[in-house]
Design a protein with these regions (language model features):
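Acidic, low-complexity terminal tails and accessory targeting/binding regions
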Residues: 35-46, 103-142
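Short beta-strand scaffold positions
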Residues: 8-9, 73, 92-93
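Glycine-rich phosphate-binding loop signature in dinucleotide/nucleotide-binding domains
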Residues: 1-2, 82-87
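Generic beta-sheet signal
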Residues: 85-96
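Generic structural signal for well-ordered alpha-helical scaffold segments
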Residues: 76-83, 102
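Phosphate-coordination/substrate-recognition cap region in phosphate-metabolizing enzymes
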Residues: 1-52, 56
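Short glycine/proline- and acidic residue-enriched helix-loop micro-motifs
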Residues: 50-70
């Protein structure tokens, strides 16, 4: 499959995934970096829930990190970047951020991102067709 642009988060795990998928020279863009978890960086959701049982990333954000509105705005920034490409775009990023991209693509409230499950190293496809912006494939194994 050919792509007109391949973008990646500047984090090594995304770059390495791009390389393993056969794309050794993606365009690095900080807009695709993982969500800034602030004080929760490095903590599991389970650990966060021990002190904040009702915490939800896309509703509450993270203390000292990105707010849900900031996550959504950055997702929209990536959509703008990708939409400027005439043709097919491939992106290597991170789970929580890619959920936000899918939700922003469909113009839904960021809180809806919590309903999306996304495994590591899976394929998802958004596109514009006669119905408008659609989530054509989600969390599919390679």
């Amino acid at each position: 499959m050919n792509f007109d642009a391949v973008f990646s988060s500047p984090l090594q795990r995304a770059i390495r995934t791009a390389e393993l998928a056969g794309f050794p020279d993606p365009q690095l863009t900080p807009v695709l970096r993982e969500v800034d978890y602030g004080e929760y960086e490095g903590m599991t959701t389970k650990a966060i829930h021990e002190s904040r049982p009702d915490w939800e990333l896309y509703r509450d954000g993270s203390p000292g990190g990105e707010t849900p509105a900031q996550i959504y705005a950055r997702a929209t920034d990536f959509i703008t970047l990708a939409s400027a490409v005439k043709g097919r775009v491939l992106a290597f990023s991170h789970g929580h951020f890619l959920r936000a991209v899918a939700i922003a693509w469909m113009r839904l409230d960021i809180k809806a991102a919590s309903a999306l499950h996304l495994d590591v190293a899976t394929l998802s496809l958004v596109r514009d067709d006669e119905r408008g912006r659609v989530l054509a494939m989600w969390n599919s194994p390679p």
